Amino acid sequence: DLHLLSRRQRQMCIRDSGTSDIAVISLGGTVVSASIKIAGDDFDEAIVRYMRKKHNLLIGERTAEDLKIKIGSCYKRAEVDYMDVRGRNLVTGLPKTVKVSSEETEEALRETTAQIVETIHSVLEKTPPELAADIADRGIVLTGGGSLLRGLEDLISAKTGINTMTAENPACVVAEGTGRYAEVMEELGK
C-alpha cells in the first residue's frame, strides 16, 4: 500500500495507456518523472518483428500477445518454457508452425525493456539524494498491466541494484490510487 502523503518515498514505474511513466512520488506530488512511448503493445510488436526476422514467420499481434502472456519473459529464468506458434512462412507463403522458447522472447524484448531501464536510470540520476536513499531502502513499485511481464521485476532489480516489486492488482492500482488521491485532496481542502 503506497501512502501518497508519506515522507517516505517510492519510485513507481507506471505502465499503461501507450506510455511508461516513471516517477518519484513524495508528499502527494511528483518530484522527478519521465515518460517514454512504450507499453504492452510495444512488447507485442517487438515479438512480431523478432518472429519475422528470426523465423521468417509472419504472426499477428494477437498471436504475439498470446506468446507474451503464456511464456514471455524479459529476464533469464531457471526453467525454459516452449510454445508452438503458427503463422505464415514469408518465403513460401504457406502456414508454418515454429516452436518458440521463453529465452527467445527475452531476446525479442531486450531492446524495448532496455529503454525502460534507461529511463529509470535517468529518473534516479535526477532524484535528490535523500529521496534516492529512501528508494534504495524501500524499493521500486511497478504498476499497470505491462508490469505483469515475467522477469520485469528481476530485470529492473538487476540493472538498478534496487529491490523491485509489482503492486498488488497492478492493472487497477493507478485508477484506485487516483481515486484515493482525489479523496485525500478534497479532505485537505475542507
Write out the residue ranges for each language-model feature:
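Phosphate/ATP-binding catalytic cores across multiple sugar-kinase/actin-like superfamilies
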Residues: 108-135, 181-185
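Acidic, glycine/GT-rich loop-and beta-edge segments that sit at the periphery of enzyme/chaperone cores
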Residues: 60, 180, 184-190
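Residue-level signature of catalytic and energy-coupling elements of molecular machines
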Residues: 14, 47, 67, 120, ...
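Phosphate-binding glycine-rich/basic clefts of nucleotide- and phosphate-handling proteins
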Residues: 27-114
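Single conserved hydrophobic/aromatic residue that forms the stacking wall/gate
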Residues: 1-13
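Glycine-rich phosphate-binding loops at beta-strand->alpha-helix junctions
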Residues: 132-156
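Conserved phosphate-binding/catalytic loops in two-lobed NTP-binding clefts
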Residues: 154-179, 188
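Short beta-strand scaffold segments in enzyme catalytic cores
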Residues: 20-25
